[in-house]
């Protein structure tokens, strides 16, 4: 490699495309790819994707899809039997990050029960003798599910396997997703001293056992349930061992620490545990919650909180349960503000109703205000938009009780306090959002006030509704034009009733029959009320007319006072306006007029009747003397002699008259321009 050349390291596909964790389509594609590849080890980026998907999908998929938080275990396997090969708690905690699902869709929860059965058949179809396969001359590890099957099957005798197959047939009809009791309640035997010694011995024995290199331990959340015909001592040891495993596995994997699998053999045990649960509810309930680490906040927000459901029974439970509930909230991380605003918490309605009843009985308004202030300070402040739109249970009932019980002054004070405590919303939201009780308040104000004060009260209401902040006059004017004024429609309806017809008249056609009396003329169409108001305003005169002159005698009269306004004109633009093509036309016009006058002066004596008579007399009596100049100019060499050429021209043609010569001189036909 050249010294200046750096090794080319391509960005991992998972880092370049972070949406991989949020796309179910990629899960389906990876499932198809795993089917094409066959059995083989998981790629590192796929394992990391499974880890990241556990954090992302936990709160989004809900309780109905929890195969991500609850790892996949083959059907018919007992958790106690699998725990024998899984190692100690330390190793279990380190290796629980690697899921045993053979493809990504199992971690995403995209595979249903049929797909799970198909995967098990595919895994069990491989003979157990094939502990490993050789690919390209090297030893390649098997898939995790197959390795777990081989590891668990190696320590069993054929009798146990046969019993397992029968257990599979029994458990196929079992409800897989019944809501679980806590693991403390499922395994009450952990509290006994004999079981603690058995747990210590079993943990020491399992921690020393080593795992095979390619194996990946499977985790479970189901609580162990044994048959009633087994020995009591074996049942206790195995139950304590299973409880130990379940207490370790959910904490390390970050899943729900409650079982999701209900077994048919536990029906009798649960009946016995209910009595123990009722007696020790105050002590046992906060135990698993306080000991378990903090779960994901999105899952917590969607789970049913047992402490919230039990708050309705606070008086019956006593002080011990209150102490237990006080210890629970610090371990629960607060969810986001958006989830708190939208997620329904069981017990909210009952709590608010109880608070309202206690407040009505005791009439302690100050205590209620202090409680509201504490609640508002404890809960994180949500967005203004969410607070204005999200419905909070108890709003309508509280406002109705306040209106019925308190006086008007108390209402004003309480509204001022609530407006001071709550963050001010935008003017747009306050103008458009409906606040319960507005209509009733406005109707009462209109009934109480007199008719002469209606306009003032409506204007005040319009300002209060449209302008929460008095520092914005532009917004006030804008919202006053668009806001709803409760008295406007009633005024227009009354005026329309007085007018005669509230609705526009239909289109009418008149047919005139000759010889009959024509129908009476229709009433002229009347404009709507708003247009009539608009026309009334400009009709009002702006100034009073002169009282001396009557309206009918008005004529156009000029004022005696004349005002002269001087127009300032610059010399440059005025001179430029004179220039143009019309200047040359004006010069030509003047020259032509001058020449016409000159020709008229010369030709006027020739056009008199006396001059014309003389000219005709000359033409009738031509002179007999020949004109030598004209005969010399005629050509004689080229053309033979003819009688026409020898004949002398007449005097009129040969000798021009004086008048024609004078006219030619006067016209100046030489071609020169004047």
Curated annotation (Swiss-Prot):
Residues 65-504, 534-554, 625-674 are annotated as: Disordered. The modification Phosphoserine is found at residue 143. One of its GO terms (biological process) is positive regulation of translational initiation in response to stress. Keywords: Apoptosis, Endoplasmic reticulum, Membrane, Mitochondrion, Mitochondrion outer membrane, Phosphoprotein, Repeat, Stress response, Translation regulation, Ubl conjugation. It is found in: Endoplasmic reticulum membrane; Mitochondrion outer membrane. Changing residue 29 to R: Localizes to cytoplasm. It holds the Pfam family PP1c_bdg. Phosphorylated at multiple Ser/Thr residues. Phosphorylated on tyrosine by LYN; which impairs its antiproliferative activity. Phosphorylation at Tyr-262 enhances proteasomal degradation, this position is dephosphorylated by PTPN2. Residues 1-60 are annotated as: Required for localization in the endoplasmic reticulum. This is Protein phosphatase 1 regulatory subunit 15A. It comes from Homo sapiens (Human).
